[in-house]
Amino acid sequence: MRDSTGAGNSLVHKRSPLRRNQKTSASLNKLSLQDGHKAKKPACKFEEGQDVLARWSDGLFYLGTIKKINILKQSCFIIFEDSSKSWVLWKDIQTGATGSGEMVCTICQEEYSEAPNEMVICDKCGQGYHQLCHTPHIDSSVIDSDEKWLCRQCVFATTTKRGGALKKGPNAKALQVMKQTLPYSVADLEWDAGHKTNVQQCYCYCGGPGDWYLKMLQCCKCKQWFHEACVQCLQKPMLFGDRFYTFICSVCSSGPEYLKRLPLQWVDIAHLCLYNLSVIHKKKYFDSELELMTYINENWDRLHPGELADTPKSERYEHVLEALNDYKTMFMSGKEIKKKKHLFGLRIRVPPVPPNVAFKAEKEPEGTSHEFKIKGRKASKPTSDSREVSNGIEKKGKKKSVGRPPGPYTRKMIQKTAELPLDKESVSENPTLDLPCSIGRTEGIAHSSNTSDVDLTGASSANETTSASISRHCGLSDSRKRTRTGRSWPAAIPHLRRRRGRLPRRALQTQNSEVVKDDEGKEDYQFEELNTEILNNLADQELQLNHLKNSITSYFGAAGRIACGEKYRVLARRVTLDGKVQYLVEWEGATAS
């Protein structure tokens, strides 16, 4: 909902309840002007108690009052109309005309006004700009004309709105002209590995802050992110985290924006709507019929389902429920934590990944990113060594966790492993042993929805976990696997799983004789050789398998707490003087009811 409030003749919006977390201050001095000259360090032109307009992460301006000023970080602490508080960078704050008689340029803070770089006054906010300081440069014809001229900030303030910017009218045409150039240099932005956040907090045509996982579009050419409120090509308002678009910005197209909707599948619809519900209601589980389907039907047009658009409303629930049950590594049922079976939620709260080529190259970085979380709960950052191991393992586990059928040979291995009467509890716990430095069970890390979620949730079934575990061992000894025959692997890998379990040694020998009836001497030799290879591969990451086997009891603690669904995190690892490996585990403190 928009609200026009007069504040310095600018259009402002009432703050929504959604808050963005305070971010690290940016190194703004590295940004360059469009003419290639380095920008001067901005002088502080703000005062405590001053009413200003602050641009938020949705691209809109909100009215607030400055309470504190941090010159070192170039930011102001602002209290908004709804009593919310936040630090805002100077670059995202707009002030009205100063009361003093001196007119200075808003950009360079200089007073001179000489051709061909004269001072031009905005007819909306009363701020002054040099012709060459403003982006884009102000043409000399504007000075001689009697027509009203609006600065870049005022053009965006009067045209941007929720659901998309204005498409018609003189201000809309002025916005299209402004969007041909950016007020910053894209080359100077310092991006993360997944190209989703930058240090300068500079996005879109407006140069303001942004959150890629909310309502933003990424240009498939320059990879910059753009606010929903600033683009003029949308026919319907966006959903949170909806990236199923092929989008080209006005800068790359040298004209109007290009937008094309990508096809959706039922699993994408279920994932996208569950993600939106979790953002809106701040909870994880939703009734599949009363809440999820109600949201899907109410927002059916905003989903742009394409080929699925003609599906009758009475048949939609059947398709959605099938997707929820088929993609168990993506969706979590309530029965897994002893709740009602018709409750569903996302295992990892991240937006769905679009299937277009532009995002395929980003799948790997996104799977290991830790940039965003909506709950505001801190997430531990794994070490670089464990992250590299995780990447290698997730690549292998990914093929078996997205619902795609495994190959005939892999299926044979899984079947032989599933035949073992292993304790379901011990099987589901074992995958976390491979990566003790990573977080065992948190929702804070933003993994890709297509990656294996076994490491982050403790409610996966025994068959799924066994499949993921086999994938891990195959990934760890991938370089040596090619030199072995296929017959030795089905025998060696289940044997390795039993040695790492918690069943008695005698029971393991009995099960081994039932499953594998080949030459035992040859099998033992292959196991010892395989075990040695895995230990050698893990030596660089200091994750020795024998240490883990000897410290299973110390690592897991009370098995009953895990069986009840209590979540935990591994905080630290140490080696005692007598060579024992111990882990510091943080329990959530409450079991699932």
Swiss-Prot record:
Q: Which residues are in the Tudor domain?
A: 44-101
In the UniProt record, does the keyword Phosphoprotein occur? yes
Q: What happens when the gene is disrupted?
A: Mice survive to birth; however, most of them die before weaning. Axial skeletal alterations that are characteristic of posterior transformations are observed: ectopic ribs that associate with the seventh cervical vertebra (C7) are frequently observed. Consistent with this malformation, sternums are shifted anteriorly. The odontoid process, which is normally a characteristic of the second cervical vertebra (C2), is frequently associated with the first cervical vertebra (C1).
Region Disordered: start-end pairs: 1-24, 357-410, 444-486
Q: Cite the residue ranges of zinc fingers (PHD-type).
A: 102-157, 201-255
- Quaternary organization: Associates with the PRC2 complex, which consists of the core components EED, EZH1 or EZH2, SUZ12, and RBBP4, and various combinations of accessory subunits including AEBP2, JARID2, PHF19, MTF2 and EPOP. Forms a dimeric PRC2.1 (class 1, PRC-PCL) complex consisting of at least SUZ12, RBBP4, and PHF19 or MTF2; PHF19 and MTF2 stabilize the dimeric structure which enhances PRC2 interaction with chromatin.
User: What's the protein name?
Assistant: Metal-response element-binding transcription factor 2
**Organism, as annotated:** Mus musculus (Mouse)
